């Protein structure tokens, strides 16, 4: 069955509240993983839910910047990432992380796991490759904890070349009436406002 059809079914379940599982979207570079994750985010937003969408580095740069802002703490950011209705981390494994990044990623993933909240991940890598990409100095302990949690929380969909070639016509046909089918827009976050209003809908 085509990956796009499976994603549509997944989103329908999220909206109806019949699943709180997350989703791993894997595939080679350029097959449309980010676009598909954007479609998911837009549909969840359309149905009145809050979404954070960004790369891991983007997410944590906002947290790191809070060290110079006395009004917003890294704990505020952590709480946002842990409690938003849907968190989308795009292109996981692209950048080599630091120990600080892995520590924060584990806290976010573990908090969402404990709160029964979904997370969507896009990545070019399979499980073993992602393990190697995230590992620092052959210390696999925290990486294994992160990946184990993610795979326990998430189902998986692989986008192949055939799916990519079919994607334009299939999205127009199957998502025309029910999906908010437009490109996701990147906006600059007013973090102070977001911290004050935990129900705000926003995207990176």
Identify the meaning behind each predicted range.
Residues 1-23:
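Pre-Walker A (pre-P-loop) alpha-helix and adjacent loop at the N terminus of AAA/AAA+ ATPase modules
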Residues 4, 45-83:
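Short glycine-rich substrate-engagement loop in P-loop NTPases that contacts/grips substrate
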Residues 19-37:
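Walker A/P-loop nucleotide-binding motif
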Residues 35-48:
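P-loop NTPase Walker A phosphate-binding motif
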Residues 49-50, 83-86, 115-121:
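Loop/turn-to-beta-strand initiation segments
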């Amino acid at each position: 069955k085509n990956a796009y059809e499976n994603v549509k079914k997944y989103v329908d379940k999220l909206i109806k509240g019949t699943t709180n599982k997350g989703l791993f979207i894997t595939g080679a570079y350029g097959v449309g993983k980010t676009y598909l994750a954007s479609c998911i985010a837009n549909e969840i937003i359309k149905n009145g839910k809050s979404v954070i969408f960004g790369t891991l580095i983007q997410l944590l740069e906002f947290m790191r910047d809070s060290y110079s802002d006395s009004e917003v703490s890294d704990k505020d950011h952590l709480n946002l990432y842990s409690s938003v209705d849907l968190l989308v981390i795009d292109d996981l494994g692209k950048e080599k992380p630091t120990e600080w990044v892995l520590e924060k990623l584990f806290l976010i993933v573990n908090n969402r796991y404990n709160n029964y909240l979904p997370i969507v991940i896009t990545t070019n890598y399979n499980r073993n490759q992602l393990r190697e990409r995230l590992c620092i100095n052959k210390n696999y302990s925290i990486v294994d904890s992160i990946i184990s949690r993610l795979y326990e929380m998430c189902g998986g969909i692989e986008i192949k070349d055939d799916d990519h070639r079919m994607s334009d016509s299939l999205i127009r046909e199957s998502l025309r009436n029910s999906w908010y089918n437009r490109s996701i827009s990147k906006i600059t976050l007013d973090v102070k406002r977001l911290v004050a209003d935990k129900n705000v809908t926003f995207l990176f």
